[in-house]
């Protein structure tokens, strides 16, 4: 978002600190904010989901906060997010992962490896220009992908030079550091891919014994 419009990044001039952009084809404000001021932990996102699921209204909320809570819960139930993982947003698709921002960031890189353009939001990722069948096909490709192919994951990071002195570090070394630092999250992503339910395919509920 910039100047009230959505833009698609087409190029990055890191030396001049310049982004080359074109108007986003969707041309509308996204439903979910895709840029986060700070990282969110798994436990925080899990607690947010429990708040959406609950009917309790904390006594300390003022009238405006109560109205926002009601709207959030109505949206959660309208999108059937207790059972479903995907929801269309104009020409894009929101994928709800219900994990922290670090997990979502790794998931976005994994989707890039499958040919999808994804950006993180507070509750997962938004996939630009995607449909449910397209995402399902990409996830199926990832499920079949051999372990050695996952070692190429850093090749799909949009900007691996995120640290202050990363420009001074050889890029292949940065890639190895990224793999080592995110190994457990990568394994979590691989496990979660088989559990994602498309909007047209509700996730089965587990029966209580």
Can you say where each PLM-predicted feature lies in the sequence?
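C-terminal effector modules of nucleic-acid-centric enzymes and ribosome-associated factors
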Residues: 1-209
